[in-house]
Structures are given as C-alpha cells and as structure tokens.
Amino acid sequence: MEKFTIHTGTAAPLRRSNVDTDQIIPAVYLKRVTRTGFADGLFSGWREDQGFVLNDESYSDASILVAGPEFGTGSSREHAVWALRDWGFRAVLSPRFGDIFRGNALKGGLLPVELELEAIEEIWNRVEADPRTPVTVDLDARQVRVGEATWSFALDEFSRWRLMEGLDDIGLTLRHEVVIGDFEASRPPFLPTVT
C-alpha cells in the first residue's frame, strides 16, 4: 500500500449527500477479485449524465473527492474503495462517512477526512470557482489546507500510523514474519505451517 503523509492535489466537488456504496460502484462491477480495474464502474450510473462532475475535464486530474454528508453508506463493499483509488483519489472529504466504508477506506489506503459541512461548502465554492485550486491533506498535522484556510480533522493514532507507513492488513502481518517463522519452527513438524 502506498504511504500517505501529505498529499496536495486538485479536488472534485461532489455536491451530493447520502451516497451509498451501490452508487459508488454498482453490483454489476463486483465480479472481479483483484483490487484493480474498477475505475470504469465508479459512479457509472451518474457518469451517463454529461453534466456529472467527473465528466468535466476541469476535474479530470482530481485526486481528492469532496462529498456531502453520509458518504459511503450501505453495504460493505471494498470495491467502492478500490474504484475510488483506481480513479486516482487519495482522500475523500465529507461531514460524515458510513462506518463500514470508513473502515474499508482506511484499510485500503484511501483517507476519509471528516470536516464540518461549512468547511466542505467552502472547499466546494473554492474549487468550483477555480478547479486548479490546490488542496492539501496533511495527515502528519491532521489538517486540510486550501489557500489561507486550514481545518483540523481527527483520526485515531493507529489508523494514522498505518497510512503513514503504507501498511494494509497483510503488510502489518508481514512486519511480524520473523516471529511467525520462529513460532512455526518451534511446533511439531506434523502441524501445518503458512510457508
């Protein structure tokens, strides 16, 4: 998983609330078992509308999605995180996230940042006025910066550390590979091992 410390990029304003995981990536795209190749399914129902924000060339390089409240609600769908990452998003800003989506995002290298609705609206206004506006998400300082405006966000220390180290569940386990190997070596040879 790619490390996340400080990311500066442009942002796409998704002025919608109650975006569930089926809207993020419809079930028809869930037949793959790899973590890549899902960008084509991201918001596919909405991308049929030429006025949809991700169809606007001004936001084609956006790496931060700025969404309304209740983003990522609904069923547990890791594919929603994979589709957002495949599109190129590193962070999603929203006043509230679905709990399961938030957990999947943190494990999948996508930073979910909760900010007050007033902050989200200010960021929307700024990036709509100038789509090239740089937005900085600073995980080290736990801040979002746009121009002279700065907003702080909360994130538990363990999740922050994992993202900054670039550790998914497998990477975290592999940090203990020597201890696991020593444990397996101490067991009777007729017992199964993971090697």
Swiss-Prot record:
EC number annotated for this UniProt entry: 4.2.1.33
Top EC group: lyase
A GO CC annotation given for this chain: 3-isopropylmalate dehydratase complex
GO biological process, one term: L-leucine biosynthetic process
Pathway: Amino-acid biosynthesis; L-leucine biosynthesis; L-leucine from 3-methyl-2-oxobutanoate: step 2/4
Assigned keywords, A-Z: Amino-acid biosynthesis, Branched-chain amino acid biosynthesis, Leucine biosynthesis, Lyase
UniProt-listed Pfam families: Aconitase_C (PF00694)
SUPFAM superfamilies in the record: LeuD/IlvD-like
Catalytic reaction list: (2R,3S)-3-isopropylmalate = (2S)-2-isopropylmalate
Record-linked InterPro entries: 3-IsopropMal_deHydase_ssu, Aconitase/3IPM_dehydase_swvl, AconitaseA/IPMdHydase_ssu_swvl, IPMI_Swivel, LeuD
GO MF annotation terms: 3-isopropylmalate dehydratase activity
Function: Catalyzes the isomerization between 2-isopropylmalate and 3-isopropylmalate, via the formation of 2-isopropylmaleate.
NCBIfam families linked to this entry: leuD, PRK01641.1
Family: Belongs to the LeuD family. LeuD type 1 subfamily.
Record text on subunit structure and interactions: Heterodimer of LeuC and LeuD.
Protein's recorded name: 3-isopropylmalate dehydratase small subunit
Organism whose genome encodes this protein: Salinispora arenicola (strain CNS-205)
